[in-house]
């Protein structure tokens, strides 16, 4: 308890010291208690806002008695001893921090005091030196003033003598002007120095012309310069002058005050003659133009880039130099206006453009597109430099020339794509028609289709990459409005991509629409099938991919011309595919029908013997349709079939089918039965679905085979209707029909179509039979199974 009281008294003493600090009393080592309190304790605002707590040892309202009373009442003896030890440690730590803070601040204060004392000593020494410097400057100023006053008269006399000497020099130089002019204006000398000398002396001589001596000097100088002007005019007419020498000659004549309008005319005349000679040199490299176009032109000796380089470095560069010289020589002078330079330059550039057009027309085939783009780029850059000097010298014509060259190259790429596609078709036809060794299969239709499609698409992508060179960022003319909008849309997208796709669809459709020329082989059915699949693939994916790729490489402007929508192209491709597939069905159906027609027309149906086998032509029909099924299945999906009945493979003709008529009614057929049978067949037609023979074919294998079977059986029906049959002829038709039913129903989308057509064949045969006695169904089945 004594230790707690001692700690409490110590704390109270601290509180008293703080109070003493506030009033200015207390011991010296307690003075920093206030700053420590402000540093470690709460801020004034927090202390004002907090509720006064006399038991808070760190608070401003701490009361030792209240604190001790609270501690003694709440804590045990052990806790009191621990609290006393803690307070002792905190007090010692605070004292140590206070002493450290005092020592650090004391050292800084001592260092600052020493620095200030040293600065005072240094400033005293500098003040003494500045006083000495001021006194010395005053003495120097006084001495300088005395010297200037003593030498003022001499300086005035010296200036007068210098002026007289300068005047004498000028007079001497004026007297020497005629001699200098004569020496420098002589032939082969330096006329530029003579002009410079005469220009400096001319104003003085004219000003003092009223003096006889100066008049004589002026007259002699004028005579010398007149002779120089005559020699310069003679030199101006020399055809060997280059543009720089021509400009210097005209400039010297203008300095001699020759008439500007005459010099302007001669300058343009001489410049025009030189430029015409350069154009003639370019034209000499070109073959003579043939208006009829019948004569074959030889290939050019140099490439287009070399031709443009020579034209740009010679003609365009000289024209730019002459235009700049004309502006510097005659700008603002009388007689040089009225657009004379613009008209002069426009005439020459028009002829240069014509020569370049003729050279571009000599580019045969595709050549190197990058070379053409570089040539057009250099031409446009040089032309742009000329147009900065002469805006009216044919800017539109130059841009139009570049645009025409780009369009012509795109048109050639279109023709190249068309030729490439026709070549691929020729390869496909050759692969389809090539004889194959026994036991070795040729390339399948999927492989041929993949090769054809990938080759054409790869060629088209390569063409787009070549055409993209015209819109590259490093090409100067790519910034023209035409190449940002119209070229991308009309020339590339519409003129190349869309035009090629439409041409491809028309070409493919032409195999179905246009009849084969006399003597020319018709398109093989496999080619029709392959082209139909190709057009269908274009409609599904290829067209959208090509258009997307084109729009990415050649982005159209938002306000550009209207473009062909993708769905319209897809509709054309689908229409071509539909026409090709329909034609394929007609061709294959006609081939099978031709076999059936010949087999019916060449047989004696009245005198035929009792059937013992299925005719070979029926087996051939089944084999051909099976082969067609395999062929179509390579390129098209299976398709949807109508639900088949359980006895599809066992059906016979409905008219003579024992499965449909009870056995007890079979003997009722007599020679008078055909009328009843025909009537029964017609009644059945009223309740059956109408069979459309030439309906549009769907893009699947089942629909294609159904169309071929319908054409074949319809042909068989029409041929049977035109023949007269005996009993065995009817039975042979019955056997053949049952055989076809056994094998053809599985190829059709709906077996009822096959059944209905075969029923009509049977009814027609019975109607045309003289003795309609059918064969037993069991015998028919036995013959067909054996066959």
Swiss-Prot record:
Chain intervals with Gly residues compositional bias: 11-27
UniProt keyword annotations, A-Z: Coiled coil, Endosome, Golgi apparatus, Lipid transport, Protein transport, Transport
Region (Disordered): 1-39
Compartmental location: Golgi apparatus, trans-Golgi network; Recycling endosome
Major localisation: Golgi
Cellular component per GO, a single term: membrane
Pfam families: VPS51_Exo84_N
Coiled coil: 111-142, 265-287
Positions with biased composition (Low complexity): 1-10
UniProt-listed InterPro entries: Vps51 (IPR014812)
Quaternary structure and partners: Component of the Golgi-associated retrograde protein (GARP) complex Component of the endosome-associated retrograde protein (EARP) complex.
Entry similarity comment: Belongs to the VPS51 family.
Function field: Involved in retrograde transport from early and late endosomes to the late Golgi. The GARP complex is required for the maintenance of protein retrieval from endosomes to the TGN, acid hydrolase sorting, lysosome function, endosomal cholesterol traffic and autophagy. Acts as a component of the EARP complex that is involved in endocytic recycling.
Protein name: Vacuolar protein sorting-associated protein 51 homolog
Gene: VPS51
